[in-house]
Amino acid sequence: MKKLTSSEFRQMFLDFFKDHGHMIMPSASLIPQDDPTLLWINSGVATMKKYFDGSVVPKNHRITSSQKSIRTNDIENVGKTARHQTFFEMLGNFSVGDYFRDEAIPWAWEFLTSPKWLGLPKEKLYCTVYPKDVDSQRVWEKAGMPADHIVKLEDNFWDIGEGPCGPDTEIFYDRGQENNDVAEDDPENFPGGENARYLEIWNIVFSQYNHLPNGKYVDQPHKNIDTGMGLERVLSILQDAPTNFETDLFLPIIHATEEMTDGKKYGENKEDTTAFKIIADHVRAVSFAIADGALPSNSGRGYVLRRLIRRADLHGQRLGIKGAFLYKLVPVVGKIMQSHYPEVMDQRGFIENVIQNEEKRFQATLDTGLTLLDDLIDKAKKSDDKTISGKDAFKMFDTYGFPYELTFESAQDAGLKVDKKGFDAEMQAQKERARKARGDLQSMGRQDVTLMNIKDKSVFERDTYEEPHAKLLDIVVDDKLVDKADGEHATLVFDKTPFYAERGGQVADHGNIYDQDGELVAKVTDVQHAPNNQNLHFVDLILPMEKGKEYVLKIDKERREGLRHSHSATHLLHAALRQVLGEHTHQAGSLVDPDYLRFDFTAMEPMTPREIKSVEELVNQKIWEAIDVKTTITTPEEGEKMGALALFDGKYGDKVRVVQMGDFSSEFCGGTHCSNTNQIGIFKIISESAVGAGMRRIEAVTSKKAYEYLANRSSLLDDIQADVKATKPDNIIDKIDSLESDLHDSQKQVEALTKQINQAKAGQIFDDVKQAGDLTVIATVADVNGMNDLRELADNWKSGNKSDVLVLAAENDGKANMIISLGQKALDKGLKAGDLIKKVAPIFGGGGGGRPNMAQAGGKRPEGLNDAIKAVIEEISKN
């Protein structure tokens, strides 16, 4: 067995499958693109969906990759087991309708056992197969796996609902009984059982069926292979490490953490060792997630990052580390992974800054959470069972970021218990809600056989406004290939076309199709890419169309011009944002429309007005510099050497198109562009807003639309000038300032008069003193304007010692308000204003709270105020 570093092992896997004709696919971003079913990329196959469902046909049907992945469904187990991680790498080899089990199994055996490759002892390897999958058992035995090392398990069938599915085979490594956590005669002590002896290292899925909505299974027209090998698991074998955490991927991080403590060492005791593991795992996850564009927040991916950072910091405190420390480990992570993943070191400063800022913010959250936890402990001490409820513990976890363990330990120190079952039930309910929210989107989708079978070559004539005479090659109506279309709608493929198909954020061209006599036969309403890369024209038919005939294709030239302006301006905007905000700014999405453009990007804070102005000025400067727009067809590798930005998941073919605008902007792009930036004319940002946690959006217009926008603003300015009676536009601000000053003076006069009126009313109100038991009460619905006036009356009441209890209510704009104040005599009797207001507020459709001596509430049913006042007096009378 070879002793390999993580870098050597990763490269060996990729080289092995490259030697077997596979294309090495770079790791995709951890943030999924165009896949709402995933929060994170969580496996290698997650990036292959478009190939397996047939929506895209890859250049090479054999693919291999080492994919960054994050899984967060069981964060609480990280650090407590040998293998649980949030961030990990999944090695995989994939076949899209090419080879199948007769190749996949022998290759796996060769890579694992051949002295040229890993050289694992054959006697240590076992596999599991689906009982009905006799073919896999046959191929395994032929490859060299002993029959008594092949275990049949019903679980070996991969099926996630509607879509591709099939049997799978899992490979296990026998680590020996000395490494087991169950007895040798335990019924779970077998490959595939719940034990620590047999380590699962590789899974091969034979995706040969389609699971239909009606529950039936049918053969797929194209059978696929999907495999996954956990890099860290196999590395623990190659490096003779007891767990994943003793490999060269984790130990440098753990040693760096040790140096930050007051002498604590990894492995000395269980509690500290768990803390070291959690910190090492979590800093890897957050470093790569931030490098790929995620930022801490209160929802979605951002919430996961926030939770990981806080959990790591809490365990740092347990190790005696004071203050922010996690950010200091980022360069350690970057150095370990740099050979294959340079992004962490490339963005080191930004990642450190994000983590450090989040760590600093956590102290305030920690203080608040600890205060609330103290309240829960006091509450539990007064309860009969001396237990913090599972609901309260989950609230501490879900709302304030307190892991269950911290709540449990604090309760234990106070001699209390925590309802773990209740907590688990709340956690499971949340997971179930999330699962149901995604619903049927979990399916990978059925293969579209009709479109996949269209193999005719179609050429996109990108930069022409000519009207080509194109031959109609294929017609699809109601998901079937036909020779003639004579209904309302059809989908068409031509041998050549000037129509751009929607991709990369740019919407499709529209236009018309004419016959050879110049008669309109169809309107093109949309254009999309077929699996084999033809442009699919979705049309509304005017006249019948026949396969094999020639037609004249005319795009909407005005629409195309608008798209060219918007797309080139989008590239300039992206470059300007990176220059003004920093190169850590990631594009997170875009829309290129003929009327406007939309650009989403990662950012921790809103842009300032100065930043927006700087970006806008920089884009216009580049427009007016009249820079030639140059396009180059090259390889992805050469494109990167040219400095071109590769966006999103980095899935490119053998050739890419690089669009350059001088030395200011260079990107991989397949869209349509101006030939010179001056054709854009003018660029105007019309909005900058939030679209989610850590995500901002700019909307902008160009050319004619920018002129129309500015003309409308100018007209609006003229209207304002007339309304405020300014002599010229330059005087508008001064005129508005003067009007605001006059308004402020008038408001002060109104407030003074209102105060006088309220004082007069107070005299009348405070004269009406009632008796409730042995307490004096002033209680009425006052004729005042809402809560502010009620507070002012309450302040007057305090200074006058007019009664023991004050209950005032008011109606304003259909809303109900109430305030209760208690004097010392009422307080001495044990009355609390907060308790009283909570009890009666529902009577007028509201809720509220406050201190023992004063509380307030608002509601939606003012007609209930008198009944609420009566209820307060009744409660007081009981005392």
From Swiss-Prot:
GO molecular function, one term: transferase activity
CDD domains in the cross-refs: AlaRS_core
Origin: domain of life: Bacteria
Cofactor(s) listed: Zn(2+)
Chief location category: cytoplasm
Protein name, as recorded: Alanine--tRNA ligase
Binding annotation for Zn(2+): H567, H571, C669, H673
Alphabetical UniProt keywords: Aminoacyl-tRNA synthetase, ATP-binding, Cytoplasm, Ligase, Metal-binding, Nucleotide-binding, Protein biosynthesis, RNA-binding, tRNA-binding, Zinc
PROSITE patterns found in the cross-reference section: AA_TRNA_LIGASE_II_ALA
Gene: alaS
Family annotation (InterPro entries): aa-tRNA-synth_II/BPL/LPL, Ala-tRNA-lgiase_IIc, Ala-tRNA-ligase_IIc_anticod-bd, Ala-tRNA-synth_IIc_core, Ala-tRNA-synth_IIc_N, Ala-tRNA_ligase, Ala_tRNA_ligase_euk/bac, DHHA1_dom
Subcellular localization: Cytoplasm
PANTHER family membership: ALANINE--TRNA LIGASE, CYTOPLASMIC, ALANYL-TRNA SYNTHETASE
